[in-house]
Curated annotation (Swiss-Prot):
GO terms for cellular component: cell surface; cytoplasm; glutamatergic synapse; parallel fiber to Purkinje cell synapse; presynapse; presynaptic active zone; synapse. The gene is Ppfia4. InterPro entries: Liprin (IPR029515), Liprin-alpha_SAM_rpt_1 (IPR037620), Liprin-alpha_SAM_rpt_2 (IPR037621), Liprin-alpha_SAM_rpt_3 (IPR037622), SAM (IPR001660), SAM/pointed_sf (IPR013761). One of its GO terms (biological process) is synapse organization. Keywords: Coiled coil, Cytoplasm, Phosphoprotein, Repeat. Residues 688-754, 803-867, 891-960 form the SAM domain. The modification Phosphoserine is found at S500, S541. Residues 24-332, 426-470, 864-890 form a coiled coil. This is Liprin-alpha-4.
Length: 1043
């Protein structure tokens, strides 16, 4: 195999490099040895010279001494000194001779090693040459095989073409034969029909002759016949009128049926999305649980190993204690002095020299150090009164010369330190085992709860699917929902329905009887903890369990939002007598998992030992607000309220109930009345009460139902709402999605500015109402406003008719970006948020990673700015430019596709779907020319005719339908006229984005970068070349989206 040969070659290459490196090291060592030998030989030669010189000098002195008989004592001493030096030099010479012999032996050894390495290197080179030859052979075989494969593919292609041609001919022959047979059958049938018609005409002729005779006989009664005929004509006219009315009624019924079918398709799509999110949620929960379980098991293993190590240390301590006792008996006064100084409080860290440190066992030192660090880090116990005083004394320097005294003192010191640390650490071992066991039990119980929640979610999905497919919703009536409105899941938060926490942080609230549990169900309490759910299962009978199971299937997960950490604070306030151990374990549980801030309420009842695994559940609840089923919630007075979406779903359930529509209208009218009263009184937003704020969130902002329920429980006035920062919105209301928080913050800021007494009148229209729904907008469009303050409440910046439904279902498809619809709907992006989306928001939350698509979205936003976010004006201009080339700025993606088809490029028009090409991009983007459009259409470069047609028609389109003009230069690049820049001057960050208010009115948590406007792209001096991208070869980005 080629891959195995390549791996062999790589291995041989690495082996060759390794041998080469070894060879270099050996040569360096050889060179150093040779230098050392040379030095030693030089030193030896010098020593020989000195010895010879000294010997000559000694001989001369001896001759002089023989001639002179009188010798002084001074020359004798000099001769003795020279003799001692000669002996010293001879010893040095012998030492150097010995070193030289050793160097020569080492040189011989290194030479042998070099020889072996050279032989290995030669072998490796031969193997490498063989491998290269084998690789070349395999490559030649591979090229031959590829050539044979190409020949076979060409033959197969030729045979396939012949087969297709023969098949087409056979098909055409069969079609012709069938056509002729059909024509023959038609002719025969026509012939028979003509014969039958002739016979029928003959019979009619005979009948007519008979009638003629009868008519001639009845000619006298003609006036009576005429009167009867006139009566029949009048009756026929009335019947035709009734028939026309019936046809019109049928058309209306067909329209309603089509609307219902569309609504059913949307419901099915929402259910499919909910199933996907449930699946992702369950996968995330399982992964988090498995990781947490693994971490705890590993922690338990480490702790058990530490306990075993401590047991072994205790045994060693016993041995050392016996040794210390023996040393005390032999030590004498020195050891007694050390112990006396130790008890007085003089030493704990002994500094000793290197010679004395050699007597300390290294393993014992490591175990002691680890034990001391672990004890100091994990346990931190209080000092015991009976422990030896050696643990609290400063340093002592011990310098000992005798090995026996050194062993005795160090042994006593180690025994003292190990005994003290072991006595401190062994006290918490059993407590640690109990804590770990409790954590494992909590994790196992959490896993069981999650599995039960998954089963209940599957039951809900199946029940919803059966109800949607069958179309019978009669089983869900209001009476049953009021009797059974509980959701027995741990996803609900106690703070949404109750203002007081349970009485104990560790105990579980218990119901005294079955009737009490049923009373809770009737009242619509949807926030029972999971521990309470277990007691309810024990109390309720099997019949009531079946009823609860049916009720669970009818209520979506969206009705039970994740609890906020506010319940944790309530828990802490309610239990000031929590033990220190519980508080410590709670802090450890929180620090170990930062994502557990949204943990459920029942985890607090376990002493905060379980990790919060529901932090990602909030993603499930922001998908689609229209897909909510029945949701019972309680307001501050305790009354059961139903939202608009619930009532709209209840309408087709029971046809016999006529009060549902009236109830819906009454509640909707009441909510609109609250907002209308606040508008007419001119009340600032800070003075609004809780019901008005909740109605504003539900009717105008369009927040999901469980967000509204969270605000109903936590926000009691407009002042509280306007003072919420970004972190407080996430913590108090439980909105984890950053874009959901941005939506709410922008709505709050806009309302604060609109209701401010110093707010300027709006510029879009002098008559309008930001508080009306889409239906009321149509009915109130022609009505006159009598209030003088109506202008300040216009829908200039409200965008009530441009909510996230319009953005996802109409605006994004008009830009050619329908593939991002689900992400925009999930993040509840409305027109108010468009000008505040950053590049990070588009990439992370909206999954718009294509730079060309972000550019397309930005020019779509610029188009809305030019129209002052007027939806009716946009639709009007699009309708006017439907059948002619004008006002390209408002063209949709479908209109651009139709224009491409009309210029004769129908084959390439399909490539514009989901491309992001729309009229605003053509009219405003100076870098978008005919070459870029040809790249998007995927017109081949060799098709010059199609590209010429595209260039000519594109220039005509820009000249007739846009403000871009053609430069006089050679490149003929279209550029915008300078007039539009005056209309789009960059605004400073203090303008408050689209709302036009001061940034000082923002709450504390507002981000200026988020609320800052997106600047229009500056005109570059040179044309930006298109860049290769995942979908298209065009990718320049706006400056506001650059990092």
């Amino acid at each position: 195999d080629v891959s195995s040969e390549v791996e062999v070659l790589k291995a041989l290459k690495s082996l060759f490099e390794h041998h080469k490196a070894l060879d270099e090291k050996v040569r360096e060592r050889l060179r150093a040895a040779l230098e050392r030998v040379t030095t030693l030989e030089e030193q030896l030669a010098g020593a020989h010279q000195q010895v010879s010189a000294l010997q000559q000098g000694a001989g001369i002195r001896d001759g002089v001494a023989e001639e002179e008989e009188t010798v002084d004592l001074g020359p004798k001493r000099l001769w003795k000194d020279d003799t001692g030096r000669v002996e010293e030099l001879q010893g040095l010479l012998e030492k150097q001779n010995y070193e030289l012999s050793q160097a020569r032996e080492r040189l011989v050894t290194l030479s042998a090693t070099v020889t072996e390495l050279e032989e290995d290197l030669g072998t490796a080179r031969r193997d490498l040459i063989k491998s290269e030859e084998l690789s070349g052979k395999h490559q030649r075989d591979l090229r031959e095989a590829l050539a044979q494969k190409e020949d076979m593919e060409e033959r197969i292609t030729t045979l396939e073409k012949r087969y297709l041609a023969a098949q087409r001919e056979a098909t055409s022959i069969h079609d012709l034969n069938d056509k002729l047979e059909n024509e023959l059958a038609n002719k025969e049938s026509l012939h028979r029909q003509c014969e039958e018609k002739a016979r029928h005409l003959q019979e009619l002729l005979e009948v007519a002759e008979q009638k003629l005779q009868q008519t001639m006989r009845k000619a006298e009664t003609l006036p009576e016949v005429e009167a009867e005929l006139s009566q029949r004509i009048a009756a026929l006219t009335k019947a035709e009128e009734r028939h026309g009315n019936i046809e019109e009624h049928l058309r209306q019924l067909e329209g309603q049926l089509e609307e219902k079918n569309q609504e059913l398709a949307r419901v099915r799509q929402r259910e499919k999305m909910n199933e996907d999110h449930n699946k992702r949620l369950s996968d995330t929960v399982d992964r988090l649980l498995s990781e947490s379980n693994e971490r705890l098991q590993l922690h338990l293993k480490e702790r058990m190993a530490a306990l075993e190590e401590k047991g072994r240390l205790s045994e060693e301590i016993e041995k050392l204690r016996q040794e210390v006792d023996q040393l005390k008996g032999r030590g004498g006064p020195f050891v007694d002095g050390i112990h006396s100084r130790s008890h007085v409080g003089s030493t704990t860290d002994v500094r000793f020299s290197l010679s004395t440190a050699a007597h300390v066992p290294p393993g014992l030192h490591r175990r002691y150090t680890a034990l001391r660090e672990e004890s100091a880090k994990d346990w931190k116990p209080a000092p015991l009164p009976g422990v030896l005083a050696a643990t609290t004394t400063p340093a002592l320097t011990v310098t000992l010369r005798s090995p026996m005294w050194t062993r005795m003192s160090l042994g006593a010191w180690w025994a003292l330190r190990l005994m003290s640390s072991h006595l401190v650490a062994i006290l918490d071992a059993q407590t640690l085992a109990m804590m770990l066991q409790e954590q494992l039990d909590a994790i196992n119980q959490e896993i069981r709860m999650i599995q039960e929640e998954k089963e209940s979610t599957e039951l809900r999905a199946e029940e919803i699917e059966t109800r949607v497919t069958s179309g019978s919703m009669e089983a869900l009536n209001l009476t049953q929902l009021r009797k059974r409105g509980s959701i027995p899941t741990s996803l609900t938060a106690l703070s949404l329905a109750s203002a007081s926490p349970p009485l104990s942080g560790r105990s579980t609230p218990k119901l005294t009887s079955r009737s009490a549990a049923q009373d809770l169900d009737r009242m619509g309490v949807m926030t029972l903890p999971s521990d309470l759910r277990k007691h309810r299962r024990k109390l309720l009978s099997p019949v009531s369990r079946e009823e609860n199971r049916e009720d669970k299937a009818t209520i979506k997960c969206e009705t039970s939002p994740p609890s906020s950490p506010r319940t944790l604070r309530l828990e802490k306030l309610g239990h000031p007598t929590l033990s220190q151990e519980e508080g410590k374990s709670a802090l450890e549980g929180q620090d170990s998992n930062p994502s557990s801030s949204n943990s459920s309420q029942d985890s607090l009842h376990k002493g905060a030992k379980r990790k919060g695994i529901k932090s990602s559940i909030g993603r499930l609840f922001g998908k689609k607000e229209k897909g909510r089923l029945i949701h019972l919630s309680r307001d501050a007075t305790g009354h059961v309220l139903l939202t608009d979406s619930e009532l709209s779903l209840q309408e087709p359930m029971v046809p016999a109930k006529l009060g549902t529509q009236a109830e819906k209208d009454r509640r909707l009218k009441k909510k609109h009345q609250l907002l209308e009263d606040a508008r007419r009184k001119g009340m600032p937003f800070a003075q609004w009460d809780g019901p008005t704020v909740v109605s504003w969130l539900e009717l105008w902002v369009g927040m999901p139902a469980w967000y509204v329920a969270a605000c109903r429980a936590n926000v009691k006035s407009g002042a509280i709402m306007s003072a919420l920062s970004d972190t407080e919105i996430q913590r108090e209301i439980g909105i984890s999605n950053a874009l959901h928080r941005l939506k709410l913050r922008l709505a709050i800021q806009e309302m604060v500015s609109l209701t401010s007494p110093s707010a300027p009148p709006t510029s879009r229209t002098s008559s309008g109402n930001v508080w009306v729904t889409h239906e009321e907008m149509e009915t109130l469009a022609t009505s006159t406003k009598t209030d003088s303050e109506e202008g300040s409440w216009a829908q200039t910046l409200a965008y009530g008719d441009m909510n996230h439904e319009w953005i996802g279902n109409e605006w994004l498809p008009s830009l050619g970006l329908p593939q991002y619809r689900s992400y925009f709907m999930e993040c509840l992006v409305d027109a108010r948020m468009l000008d505040h989306l950053t590049k990070k928001d588009l990439r992370v939350h909206l999954k718009m990673v294509d730079s060309f698509h972000r550019t397309s979205l930005q020019y779509g936003i610029m188009c809305l700015k030019r129209l002052n976010y007027d939806r009716k004006e946009l639709e009007k201009r699009r309708e006017e430019s439907q059948h002619e080339i004008k006002d390209v700025l408002v063209w949709t993606n479908d209109q651009v596709v139709h224009w491409v088809q009309s210029i004769g490029l129908r084959d390439y028009a399909g490539n514009l779907h989901e491309s992001g090409v729309h009229g605003a991009l053509l009219a405003l983007d100076e870098n978008f020319d005919h070459n870029t459009l040809a790249l998007v259409l995927q017109i081949p470069t060799q098709n010059t005719q199609a590209r010429q047609v595209m260039e000519r028609e594109f220039n005509n389109l820009l000249a007739l339908g846009t403000d871009r003009k053609l430069d006089d230069g050679e490149e003929k690049v279209f550029r915008r006229a300078p007039s539009w820049r005056k209309r789009f001057r960059p605004r400073d960050h203090h303008s408050g984005g689209m709302l036009g208010t001061s940034a000082e009115t923002l709450p504390a948590g507002f981000r200026v970068s988020t609320l800052g406007p997106l600047q229009p792209p500056p005109a570059p001096p040179n044309k930006i070349m298109p860049e290769a991208h995942s979908h298209y070869l065009y990718g320049h980005m706006l400056s506001a989206f650059r990092d």
